[in-house]
């Protein structure tokens, strides 16, 4: 596979990479779909001008998304997808990226192992250096990107993470990865074993027991019935099925640490 074929993929992460202690730089395309619309004039000029007047980035993004589903612009979504593909390839080839430089590919972003300096293509397409991470860790289908003050998780929506997990499971992953980034494998093992014991014995805050996924619920068994609860107090914690996070987060972390 050559670099152009790889960058044609819309969603790809190196399947052979479970742990990387190395800088990973995230480059994303500014104003994603709208920049492609402007560059290739995919909609009438009056519509482009209308969207330009929308100052709020999220609102502009939603407006572009709605256009791509509008029957008056059939084919727009496909043209935008082709535009993303075209400029991912342009970014990679212009910056001489090799296959081994790519950690992950998203629709409008690349996670790579080196700094890139050719960021502007045409009049409207511009990539930006969004994040610089010091480590990468894969836990099942989750991708964890570590930096000194936080960990970014791909595979659970940011809204769910912000609402429920930043102070709990995300902190466990962040601290565990901090030990790995510092090449302190011994304390990484000690830390995760201690957390696993506290987790199994229900000594942690209820927030740690919320399933670490987009459902983000508490599976509870009481009186022989299976319940799905969105909020829980200490009195119900003893009925919570804690296996999900234990099997999908804690055991994989321990396996990674003990194999180093």
Where does each model-flagged region fall?
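Conserved acidic
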Residues: 1-260
């Amino acid at each position: 596979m050559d670099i152009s074929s790889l960058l044609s993929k819309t969603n790809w992460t190196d399947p052979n990479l479970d742990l990387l202690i190395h800088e990973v730089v995230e480059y994303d395309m500014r104003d994603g779909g709208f920049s492609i619309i402007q560059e290739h004039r995919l909609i009438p000029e009056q519509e482009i001008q209308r969207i330009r007047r929308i100052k709020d980035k999220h609102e502009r993004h939603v407006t572009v998304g709605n256009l791509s589903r509008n029957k008056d612009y059939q084919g727009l979504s496909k043209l935008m997808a082709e535009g993303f593909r075209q400029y991912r390839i342009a970014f990679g080839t212009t910056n001489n990226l090799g296959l081994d430089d790519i950690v992950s590919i998203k629709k409008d972003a690349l996670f790579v192992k080196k700094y890139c300096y050719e960021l502007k293509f045409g009049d409207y397409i511009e990539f930006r250096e969004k994040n610089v991470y010091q480590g990468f860790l894969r836990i099942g289908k989750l991708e964890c990107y570590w930096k000194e003050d936080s960990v970014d998780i791909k595979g659970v929506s940011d809204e769910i993470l912000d609402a429920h997990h930043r102070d709990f499971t995300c902190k466990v992953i962040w601290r565990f990865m901090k030990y790995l980034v510092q090449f302190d494998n011994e304390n990484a093992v000690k830390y995760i074993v201690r957390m696993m014991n506290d987790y199994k014995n229900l000594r942690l805050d209820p927030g740690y027991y919320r399933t670490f996924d987009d459902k983000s619920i508490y599976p509870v068994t009481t009186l022989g019935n299976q319940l799905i609860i969105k909020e829980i107090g200490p009195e119900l914690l003893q009925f919570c099925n804690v296996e999900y996070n234990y099997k999908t987060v804690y055991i994989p972390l321990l396996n990674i640490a003990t194999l180093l």
